[in-house]
Structure formats: structure tokens, C-alpha cells
Amino acid sequence: MTTILSVRLKNKVVIGGDGQATLGNTIMKSNVKKIRSLYHEKVIAGFAGGTADAFTLFEMFDKKLAMYQGQLQRAAIELAKDWRSDRMLRKLEALLAVADKKTSLIITGNGDVIQPEDDLIAIGSGGSYAQSSARALIENTHLDANQIVRKSLNIAANICIYTNHNFTIKELFSEK
């Protein structure tokens, strides 16, 4: 699996993730880019789960964003509907964390589109470690969103065997 973390704080939203791809208990690749900019760099997204499945979903999500002119929530809901109802797509195993300048969402293969109350998203095998760390840093420091994502991913990578220290981090300026 992996660790993907998104933090929205003050005027920024940041999504970061590690680069490890595993097959069973073997590391197959250490520099997979699991974080992407989509729709004219107005949306950032990360995935946890099967790499090929996630790339398929990224492509589909980018098409939905284009179809709905960058409306993140609408594109996410339409992707989730397709993902849930299409027999072939239902077999894809991945989670997406997506964000634009206003909204952060988790999209699942069950057809769920979840907007977290606190604009903090953590998915993947190291997600709970990264989320715990991020919560503590948000509540007890004055670090910015980028620093919180970096430090939290580092902590997750030190604990989770399916997460490495090869991070990709993207950010957008936020309206919140």
C-alpha cells in the first residue's frame, strides 16, 4: 500500500505521498508518482491501492473534471457513480484523495465521496500514522500545511513497512 496525506490549513491545501510500490511483501519500485496535478493544475490528487487501477481512475477523473468544467464535487460524484455501477470498474482497487482550492474529498470504489469535517485526509496503509501525526502538529505547532505533510509522512514512513521516504508533494493556494 502507501501513505497519502492531505492537509488544508490557512491559505493552502497540500497533498503528499510516498513512492513505494509493493507486490506482496516485496518492494517493486521506490519512486512511483502517486500525486498528480489535474485539470490545468487546478486540482491535486493522490492515490492508494493498485497502481494500474489508480492510473485508470486518474484518467477517468481528469475526463470528468473536463466534462464538468473543473467542478470537483460534481466530477467526484460522477466518477464514484461510474466506479460503483460499471462491472469492470468495480474490480479496481484504489482510493483517491482529491482537492481544489475550496474542497478536499476522498473517493472510494464503493461509490462514496467523503468530505472530511476537518479538511484532513489520510489514506493507505500508513494513513492512520500520518493522520495522527498531522493532528498533533496542527493542534500543537505553528507549522504550515507543507511542513505538516512532510513531517507526518516521514513519521508514517518510519513506522509503516509499505511506505518509504521518497515523497511527492503538491500544493494549491486555498480559499479557506
Curated annotation (Swiss-Prot):
Kindly report, in one word, the top-level EC class recorded for this enzyme.
hydrolase
Query: Which InterPro entries does its entry note?
Result: ATP-dep_Prtase_HsIV_su, Ntn_hydrolases_N, Proteasome_sua/b, Proteasome_suB-type
| One family name in Pfam for this protein | Proteasome
Signal peptide positions are none
Give one GO term, molecular function aspect. Answer: metal ion binding
How is this protein annotated for GO cellular component? Answer: HslUV protease complex; proteasome core complex
* Catalytic residue positions: 2
What does it do? Protease subunit of a proteasome-like degradation complex believed to be a general protein degrading machinery.
Family membership noted in the UniProt record: Belongs to the peptidase T1B family. HslV subfamily.
Q: Assembly and partners? A: A double ring-shaped homohexamer of HslV is capped on each side by a ring-shaped HslU homohexamer. The assembly of the HslU/HslV complex is dependent on binding of ATP.
Give the protein name, as stated in the record: ATP-dependent protease subunit HslV
